């Protein structure tokens, strides 16, 4: 799968693999951003795990799926959200209150919007998953 946006391609590949029932998916090329988002997915229970495989180029991630993702995708353009503004973006991208996760990049790293709200930091919304 090639294109201009490896991040969007990775989320699309996960979405497609989940919809047809695959238990594993290879995501390439690998990047720190994709790895951090996969870590959030793992922490929130959407995937069983992932590992980095060095293929001599950019590398790739082997993702173990568990059928918990109904939909995931990138947020384009990347909207800025203050620590008290996440509810607005939850209403826009998630199907119900407290169902799903927004992935946010902050000055403290990439994390879920729940963690960002607890820490009282804002950032840019880069992805969603439910």
Curated annotation (Swiss-Prot):
Which organism is this protein's natural source?
Haloarcula marismortui (strain ATCC 43049 / DSM 3752 / JCM 8966 / VKM B-1809) (Halobacterium marismortui)
Presence of keyword DNA-binding: no
Q: Which key words are in the record?
A: Ribonucleoprotein, Ribosomal protein, RNA-binding, rRNA-binding
Instruction: Kindly state the subunit structure of this protein.
Output: Part of the 30S ribosomal subunit.
Q: Single Gene Ontology BP term?
A: translation
Domain of life (superkingdom): Archaea
- Record's protein name: Small ribosomal subunit protein uS8
Query: What family is reported?
Result: Belongs to the universal ribosomal protein uS8 family.
Function comment = One of the primary rRNA binding proteins, it binds directly to 16S rRNA central domain where it helps coordinate assembly of the platform of the 30S subunit.
Tell me if Ribonucleoprotein is a UniProt keyword of this record. Answer: yes
Q: Which InterPro entries match?
A: Ribosomal_uS8 (IPR000630), Ribosomal_uS8_CS (IPR047863), Ribosomal_uS8_sf (IPR035987)
What's a GO cellular component annotated to this UniProt protein? ribonucleoprotein complex
Q: Name one GO molecular function term.
A: rRNA binding
